[in-house]
Amino acid sequence: MQVTSWGNTRRITIIINDMKKTKIVATISDKRCEVEFLEKLYRAGMNVVRLNTAHQDMEQALKVVENVRKVSDNIAILIDTKGPEVRTMLMDEPMHVDRGETIYLTGDPDLKMEGKLIHVSYPYFAEDIKVGDKVLVDDGDVELVVVEKKDHYLEMMVTNEAVIKNRKSVNVPGASLKLKSLSDKDRAFIDFAIDNNLDFIAHSFVRNKEDVMAIQAILDARGSKIKVIAKIENQEGVDNIDEILDYAYGVMVARGDLGIEIEAEKIPKIQRYIVKKCIESKKPVIIATQMLHTMIEHPRPTRAEISDIANAVYMGTDAIMLSGETAYGAYPEEAVTVMREVAEENEGTVPPDAGRSLVRINNEIT
């Protein structure tokens, strides 16, 4: 298949063997974004580059954008905002914790006390959390239980031996936190996306239509045609999927945080439910997280990972996403190739569906 850029500044033609309908989104880090590297992924079947702003500043993100556009204007660019999240902070060194140990969590950055104290980035943390609540740190690798509430901190019991590091995610399944949908950093990156004519903004932890409307208002005020993709990562987002689909261009089923906020065994059912809703609404849907996680360290995927990709294709998803596999994994080109081959092999069983193809600002993604 011959692919030619549509931009006015370059005429780059690359021959790639990409006959699939399902698009591949690859997360790219500024630490590995050389033109030669990106060209290999493009030849392997990458259609969209994802920038994760939780781990990049604007200078780093711009480096990726510039190199992507040196490869081909046919590669769409998606920027991923942090959204309303809580993270550990103010940790000079990692903290080792043992099972059954007592530690303390606070949202007060000025609080100091004896014992192992961890600060988090949400000032009302002690106020909003109840005794008995589970607190999951670092994508669920560390599990804590609230045993006592104080005015400015929580006493926690550690349920598994682990190491807690700075800037790691903090989740409280089922809790309703009074978090702003857009942080100052999110707003700055939305402006960055507009200034650099990016294609998609994927907003994290979308809970309702208001979260989508807040971004759309910024885009409309600046006359931008960037499309908003709502990342569904908690129960509130699942419950409000109908109103979210009324306002978002499309949806990403972000199974990482979703599997922390909701019991893991429910995720396949929720994935199928959201994909069905998107098909009914004629809105594109992306399936994300750990699709080829084994290939971060190993050259071959597991059979379960192959089945996961195939099942996403069977459901009728528009795009499938790689995260660590391409951002820092040892076998990024191989991961894209595997994803493309599995998609091509299994797309023939999916009935054609008009009107849901993932479309960027100017044209359909090729």
Q: For the regions a protein language model found, what residue spans apply to each?
A:
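Non-catalytic helical/linker scaffolds that mediate oligomerization, partner binding
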Residues: 15-366
